[in-house]
């Protein structure tokens, strides 16, 4: 059976950047990594309804810079900046150093793989048919300029006794092309029947050879199941 390499890890240092930017010696590396995981989990839990896509952590000279990419910056900042000030204090206590928080707005959440996956997962939790949720996500992404998108769901779909996986794709999603700008996101839908996993790949075009980008509708829609 074939297994797909993680699209982000595959392109690190080529077209993708690291989500944690710092240097640590062998004695501090584990501590920094564990702290980063705790901070990310804390922020995602705290801002569960703020459509947070990515969290980037930098550690310049005994300080910390946390950049939160969100589609709803108003919820993160709060009234007169009260919420972000409170969040800054809580993150600083977790990290043990002064923290500065930047907010980056995501202009087109329909093209962000993580937010698309979370949107599909939320629809599945509201008992919307999985095929309708997948096709809606694919249609929105293609309408807003994606060159290709693939949505994959797996689990007890529609409450079936036997778990299975199904996917829907439109356009091109070249997973082996390093210069391809592939955004990848994962989410989970916690339904009454169990957990349904959602994976999304969004192809936004080629980064290096931008003059030779293929047309957005190069391939027709395909559907499959496993």
Curated annotation (Swiss-Prot):
GO biological process: translation
Domain KH type-2: 39-107
Keywords from the UniProt entry: Ribonucleoprotein, Ribosomal protein, RNA-binding, rRNA-binding
Domain of life, source organism: Bacteria
Gene Ontology cellular component terms for the protein in this record: cytosolic small ribosomal subunit
Record's signal peptide: none
GO MF terms, alphabetically ordered: mRNA binding; rRNA binding; structural constituent of ribosome
Oligomeric form and interacting partners: Part of the 30S ribosomal subunit. Forms a tight complex with proteins S10 and S14.
Similarity section: Belongs to the universal ribosomal protein uS3 family.
General function of this protein: Binds the lower part of the 30S subunit head. Binds mRNA in the 70S ribosome, positioning it for translation.
Protein name: Small ribosomal subunit protein uS3
Gene: rpsC
């Amino acid at each position: 059976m074939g297994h797909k390499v993680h699209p982000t890890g595959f392109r690190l240092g080529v077209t993708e950047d690291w989500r944690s930017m710092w240097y640590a010696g062998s004695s501090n590396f584990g501590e920094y990594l564990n702290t980063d995981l705790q901070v990310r989990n804390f922020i995602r839990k705290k801002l569960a309804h703020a459509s947070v896509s990515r969290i980037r952590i930098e550690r310049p000279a005994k300080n910390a810079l946390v950049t939160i990419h969100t589609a709803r910056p108003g919820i993160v900042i709060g009234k007169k900046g009260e919420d972000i000030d409170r969040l800054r204090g809580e993150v600083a206590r977790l990290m043990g150093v002064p923290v500065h928080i930047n907010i980056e707005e995501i202009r087109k959440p329909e093209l962000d793989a993580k937010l698309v996956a979370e949107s599909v997962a939320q629809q599945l939790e509201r008992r919307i048919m999985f095929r309708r949720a997948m096709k809606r996500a694919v249609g929105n992404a293609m309408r807003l300029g994606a060159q290709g998108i693939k949505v994959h769901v797996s689990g007890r779909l529609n409450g079936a006794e036997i778990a299975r996986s199904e996917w829907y794709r439109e356009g091109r999603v070249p997973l082996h092309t390093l210069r391809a700008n592939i955004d990848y996101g994962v989410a989970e839908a916690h339904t009454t029947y169990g957990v349904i996993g959602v994976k999304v790949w969004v192809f936004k075009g080629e980064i290096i050879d931008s003059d030779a980008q293929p047309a957005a509708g190069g391939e027709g829609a395909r559907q499959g199941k496993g």
